[in-house]
């Protein structure tokens, strides 16, 4: 699964799953541009990628920011071959208490940004008749979760978007897929107390949380030449928590 000569853009790459994805794609030979919301975050990405890529500051909810970053990538690296839409946020609340902005912020960051970025890189991929778009979803987008109606709706939307876009661009050599993580060992899960952690693990037949590297491995496979005949799919990586 060699990615030599490919340029990969990974959003939300400063930590957790995004960082693991950026690191693994770089290990496989890709030149990786990882994004963060701040200049300091972008510098941290540049530091860990070293000669294998660089970090850039990107506001995924701002069309002008997206345009500027993609122009910079094109000028320096010649365009994007692999897009990994990983950036996302949570604004958890019960639906009865959910504020308008808690809904709209999630939709803008977790769904609309995927539309904007995917559309922005698509023309270049279609001209080359080759490209990979990989969206990071969530098990919640399929099974739902109390207190996350906004997040679940956005992640379910990612799956529908993936399937529709895949149908449109498959004949041009561009694949579009989703990787849907379950409970993964990140800063968010490390903050769980013992009771919460026990309750979480009780839902996972594998009996453990996933490692960010395991999500990265799924992404790296879908980004590879070996996955050229896979498109419109959602690859669930959740330790058996939810089986489709």
Curated annotation (Swiss-Prot):
UniProt similarity note: Belongs to the short-chain dehydrogenases/reductases (SDR) family.
Binding site for NADP(+): 12-15, 37, 59-60, 86, 151-155, 184
Entry-linked SMART domains: PKS_KR
Pathways involved: Lipid metabolism; fatty acid biosynthesis
CDD domains for this protein: BKR_SDR_c
Residues annotated as the enzyme's active site: 151
Gene3D superfamilies, per database record: NAD(P)-binding Rossmann-like Domain
Functional note: Catalyzes the NADPH-dependent reduction of beta-ketoacyl-ACP substrates to beta-hydroxyacyl-ACP products, the first reductive step in the elongation cycle of fatty acid biosynthesis.
Pfam families: adh_short_C2
MF (Gene Ontology): 3-oxoacyl-[acyl-carrier-protein] reductase (NADPH) activity; NAD binding; NADP binding; oxidoreductase activity, acting on the CH-OH group of donors, NAD or NADP as acceptor
Protein name stated in the entry: 3-oxoacyl-[acyl-carrier-protein] reductase FabG
Residues that bind substrate: 138
Signal peptide, first to last residue: none
Quaternary structure and partners: Homotetramer.
InterPro entries from the UniProt entry: 3oxo_ACP_reduc, NAD(P)-bd_dom_sf, Sc_DH/Rdtase_CS, SDR, SDR_fam
Keywords, ordered alphabetically: Fatty acid biosynthesis, Fatty acid metabolism, Lipid biosynthesis, Lipid metabolism, NADP, Oxidoreductase
Catalytic activity: a (3R)-hydroxyacyl-[ACP] + NADP(+) = a 3-oxoacyl-[ACP] + NADPH + H(+)
